[in-house]
Structures are given as structure tokens and as C-alpha cells.
Amino acid sequence: SVMVDKFGSASAHKANVDLEYKRNIERYEFLRWGQKSFDNFRVVPPGTGICHQVNLEYLAKTIWSSSGFINNKKVELAYPDTVVGTDSHTTMINGLSVLGWGVGGIEAEAAMLGQPISMVVPEVIGFEIKGKIKEGITATDLVLTITEQLRKKGVVGKFVEFFGEGLKELSIPDRATISNMAPEYGATCGFFPIDEETIKFLKVSGRDEKGIQLVKKYAKLQGLWEDYKKNDRVYTDKMQLDLSQILPSLAGPKRPQDKIVLSKVSDEFLKSLKSEFSQKNISNLSKVKGENFEMDHGHVAIAAITSCTNTSNPSVMVGAGLLAKKAAKLGLKTKPWVKTSLAPGSKIVTDYLTKSGLQKYLDKLGFHLVGFGCTTCIGNSGPLDKNISDTIGKNNLIVSGVLSGNRNFEGRINPFVKANYLASPPLVVAYALA
């Protein structure tokens, strides 16, 4: 529900939040009533972040415990945490070894009222991760590579389970990034097993120590613990990826699975002008009314650090901040035709960016906070400057958007921005400067 109406200033966040409340006041009042009226219904306040990122950072337990009855005798039960959500990227939590996926509103409401969710037992694809990640390679590069491979394989309606020695190289935020994009690679979910990284994340995110010990003990007793010694699990089929082969990448201009190696993006865009956008000429330099600059095919009109996919990952967010710091100290500035925005999936992101001293450099480049929630990747990028959109429309310019989101389908990001590329947050900053 967050729209990037205002951007590029310190007041943008407050202005967008005020508009969000104005547009959604009836919804929020209804949810508040629900929280007061039902014992088993809790509401995370508006402006807190994206539901599945909040679930990863605060709520999920991996192994759940509660009181129950066996043969009319009250006992304490332990069982794996599971979740269904009305956002397709609910799958993100599989990175923390919690089985979950997106469902429709009616299914979710039925589950809230105690009804079971039925499903056909799915095929399971085993995806082996091996090798080590090279320096400079991000979780975004990795997930775009995995998305490309799994789309080619065909995993619609199937579970994907990741295994192998290479998992030791992946933090929980890295795994969550991969699990998040399950809808884009077509799977019902992309699941990671419980291991020491799981325990480490539960500890650093402030989970209850007793609950953490339960996770470890339960997983080992039930055979759910990943020790990397051998994998005798039976899968429908298997795939493999060597982390050392991953290259810096983007995906676009219209689909998340269309990965392009960074060094070839310019050449591929020029090809797409003719093949995808039916342009006869590779250049159409056009003056922007009322401004002292011109725009052409390929100019980046939107640069958005956005969505749960990447803002949940501190390594790429800090990377974006460090790049902004270096650029600001060199006196570099964002191009005047670029609409910049920072919309994290939770308040934790701005907390560590501010405490580390990096937020001020992002601000200098125009990446001010615009809100906490889904924005550009669901089409809530907000309007471009009128003179810029008029120039694009009048001259049929194929301009670009670069976003750290998970979807870039044509017409989704902005009606005037036809070529959209998924990229890591550091690359979003770089393209805003280019």
C-alpha cells in the first residue's frame, strides 16, 4: 500500500506515510478492530515493514512448541514451524527452515479459523550447492542465476530443496533471498535445512534461548539436522550449481529469469531495442522541456532500492551504502532524470544504515527513505516528473528502471518505463550515477 509519491528529500517518508494512512484508513481501522476482538489475532502496525520480512526477523521460531493432549493427557508438544501468507513471497521464510508459501485470501482466512489446507504431495527437486563464492559476488547474482536455471528446468508446482557443502557459504539472509524468489523460478517453495547457520541467525536476531536449544535438539533427534556428511535423501530429480562460477548479473528487460551478465548489459539492451521494443534506431535524443538535459533510449529513469528480496540482506545493503559513501566523497551525483528511492522491508535496515553512518551518504545521492513496504516492485513507484514522462511518451523513448526487487514484468514498474532490470542494491546505486 506504500506509494512513492514523494522522493529525494528527508521529508519524503513522512509525506508518503501520511498519504498511505489517508488511502487505507478503513482497512487499518478494521484490522485494529480485529486485533481487539480475537484472542488469536495479532496485527503488526502499518509502516513497520513487509509481513514476511518481519516474520523472518522477529516472529518465526523454526520449531514450535505448545501444550496439547495425547490420550486425554496434557503434554508439551514440539513440531516444525509452518506458515501460509497472502503474499506470494511468503516463501522467503524457507531460508530459515520454515516451510511456507503464498495462498489466496480465502485459504488464509480459512486457516486462521482452524481449517486445514489440503494439497497433493509434490515432487521435490534436490538442488546441490557446492564451491565457494568469489569476492564481489552478491546474493542477488546468485539468486538470478538460480532463477534462470530452475525456470529452464521447469519446477512449477514442485518443492525445491537445497543441500550440499556449499550451504556453509550461505548466511540465512542469503538463503532467504534465494527462497524469496521461489515464485519467480516457479516452485511452490525453495527450502533450506536446519544447520549451524540457522542457530546462529536465531541467536543474533534475539530469539528465546530455550527455543533455540529446542530447535537444535529437535532437528537432530528427528533427522532434520544438516551435517553435510552425506545426503541419502531421495529426490524426484537433482540439479547442481558451483558457487565459484557465479558472475555479477542483472535480469531483464521484462522477466526475472532473463539473466544478463553485467559486462553484456549494454549490448543486450541495444539488441532488445529492436527485438523486444520494435525500435528502428538505437538513439532518439530528446530535449526535456524546462530542463537543461536530454534523454535517450536506455536512460535510467528509476533507481529503486526496494523489496523484501534484497533489503532483507545486510551484506548487499551495506554494500550499497559503502558505494554511496565512496561516490559522495568523490563528488559524484545522481543523474537529474533518475527517480531514486529507498524502501526497505523493515525498520531494522534503516537502523543499521543510520548507526553505521551510511544512510547520510545514500541521502546525498537521493536515496532517502520513502517508506517501509512493497513499493516499486509491485508497481507503486509513483509518478515520474511530468516533464520527464511527457518527453518519454511524446518521443516513445525506451527508458530503463533498475530495482533491487523480484519482478520486472512489462508495464508493472511504471507505465512510462518499459525496460526494467533486477539488480543488487550496489548496482542500483551505480546505475543511478552512470
Language-model segments: what does each one mean?
Residues 1-434:
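Fe-S-dependent hydro-lyases/dehydratases of central metabolism
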